[in-house]
Each structure stands twice: as C-alpha cells, then as structure tokens.
Amino acid sequence: MDYLGVDISKRSSVVAHYKNGKFQKEFFIQNNKNGYNYLLKYLNDLDHPQLIFESTGIYSRGMERFCCVNQINYIQMNPLEAKFKTSALRS
C-alpha cells in the first residue's frame, strides 16, 4: 500500500511517500492548482494511495477538497492526536 504523509503549511506542502513501510520519495508542492495537479499525476501512478495529513484549519481545507473532488482516500488527523502519536513513536 502507498501512504503519503503531507505536512501542510500556508503556501506549500511537503509530501513523503512510503510504500509497504519503506520510504520512497519526498517532494514539495505549492498549495495551488499547479501543485495539486502535480500531486494528482503522481497519485495516478500508484495503486490505492492513502493520504494522511494533520488538520491545520484553513490550510488543510484545500487538501481535503482536493481529496474529495478526486476521490482520493485520506485521513485527516486531529493535531493533538498527531502530537501524541509522534511522541509515542519517539519514546
């Protein structure tokens, strides 16, 4: 399975791609039409991709809409939940 973790900020996002638990690639996209088109082309080459990103309020809404419009599976995590999961991994 292909999992893509997305760190969303105001103008851009960092995407980290893992396949079967192994790191594949990291890349940046702009949070605009061109960036989302690039991401869509990348995702179209994968089998059953799953996007995972933290709910960052207004910044994550664009990614959520992108996923819904393009019927891409995604998990939107609560920021507090993401922090606890990250802390648990580090200990």
Regions found by a protein language model. Give the residues of each.
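Phosphate- and other anionic-substrate recognition elements at nucleic-acid/protein interfaces
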Residues: 1-91
